[in-house]
A protein has these predicted regions:
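Bacterial N-terminal signal peptides that target proteins for export
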Residues: 1-10
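C-terminal motif of bacterial Sec signal peptides marking the signal peptidase cleavage site
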Residues: 17-20
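Small-residue-enriched, tightly packed secondary-structure blocks
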Residues: 22-181
Length: 181
């Protein structure tokens, strides 16, 4: 029980520390670059998995994270920035922070697409009341192509490793933030 409490506190502190990073790039050039990279990442993904781009663009809204960096040895974390769209219009920026604790070793980069299936999920996200709850993940090894999709209350998450090597069996919590355009 004490280990569980300490682990929960540690994961929360890692997430809190990464959440302190800014959600939107500070310079106009940085924001423009992020928008370009997000659009290119979604288009490239659609070439590998036809229909992903259409699914996102026809939804209520979506957040595209062109690159999230993740690493850990025992304790780990991830951070990335993304672009948020509502009905196809760029409305803001998103920050993704993740804290992990458990058996893990390595580092990787991945892209993530969060599609909001309904208006309520998008509004929760914009109001800062949107976290991907803690979950236990299985061992993940990325040597080539891999992709996963999961649907949770009001949103669908697409995930694709870009590179690196990561083995993990962890408890993780992912926090998301939003900054209007």
């Amino acid at each position: 029980m004490i280990y569980s409490t300490r682990a929960s506190i540690l994961v929360a502190l890692v997430i809190w520390g990464m959440a302190a990073c800014s959600t939107a790039p500070r310079s106009p050039e940085g924001r423009d670059d992020l928008v370009r990279r997000a659009a290119a990442a979604l288009t490239a993904w659609n070439q590998e998995i036809p229909g992903v781009e259409g699914f996102a663009r026809q939804s209520v809204g979506y957040a595209m994270f062109p690159e999230v960096a993740k690493g850990g040895i025992g304790i780990g974390g991830a951070y990335g920035r993304g672009v948020v769209y509502e009905r196809g219009q760029h409305i803001g920026y998103a920050g993704l922070s993740q804290g992990t604790l458990g058996l893990q070793f390595g580092g990787q980069a991945y892209k993530e697409l969060i599609v909001f299936d309904d208006k309520a999920a998008l509004e929760r996200f914009k109001q800062g009341r949107f976290d991907l709850s803690a979950a236990t993940s299985a061992i993940l090894v990325k040597w080539g192509y891999a992709a996963s999709v999961r649907t949770v209350e009001g949103f669908t998450v697409f995930y694709k490793p870009l590179g690196g090597f990561m083995r993990e069996m962890v408890v993780a919590g992912q926090s998301l933030s939003f900054a209007p355009r």
